[in-house]
Regions:
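Helix-turn-helix/winged-helix DNA-binding modules
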Residues: 3, 20-21, 55, 76-77, ...
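Short, leucine-enriched amphipathic alpha-helices that occur as contiguous helical runs
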Residues: 4-12, 56-64
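Basic, amphipathic alpha-helical hairpins
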Residues: 10-23, 43, 47, 65-78, ...
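Basic/polar phosphate-binding segments, predominantly the helix-turn-helix DNA-binding elements
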Residues: 26-61, 85-107
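…primarily DNA-binding HTH/wHTH and HhH modules…
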Residues: 62-74, 78-79, 83-122
Length: 122
């Protein structure tokens, strides 16, 4: 169980340390030198959710940060919610907006708009 718990920690660390890398489950499994079953069981034991949901939640956090921070958008060369959504691998516009709103309590466009109102010009 300790090894599976460590796999989940490694998954979270890898995704946070590689935010600009494509983050497919198969790619992460390969990076972590593990199996889908071990990673799945480790995530469920540690966090109560599967690795796909872990990946999705972390990607949502990355999206949220990019929507709030113009410096991140500039570094990634993305300008719109649509660009950010695509950059982080969310395929369906409608599904993405619904998932984002459930997770953060507001639509992605509202996050970006609110952030632009509160940012202080240089």
């Amino acid at each position: 169980m300790i090894q599976r718990h460590e796999l989940c920690k490694d998954l979270v660390a890898w995704v946070f340390n590689n935010p600009d890398q494509p983050q497919s489950l198969e790619g992460v499994i390969k990076e972590l030198h593990t199996t889908r079953a071990s990673l799945s069981q480790g995530c469920k034991e540690s966090l109560g959710i599967g690795p796909m949901e872990v990946l999705r939640n972390i990607r949502l956090e990355h999206v949220h940060q990019a929507l709030k921070d113009p410096e991140i958008r500039q570094r990634l060369n993305v300008k719109s919610v649509e660009d950010i959504r695509k950059h982080y691998g969310f395929q369906s516009r409608g599904n993405f907006a619904a998932i984002y709103a459930d997770y953060f309590g507001e639509k992605p466009y509202a996050t970006m708009k609110r952030a632009s109102k509160t940012s202080i010009p240089n």
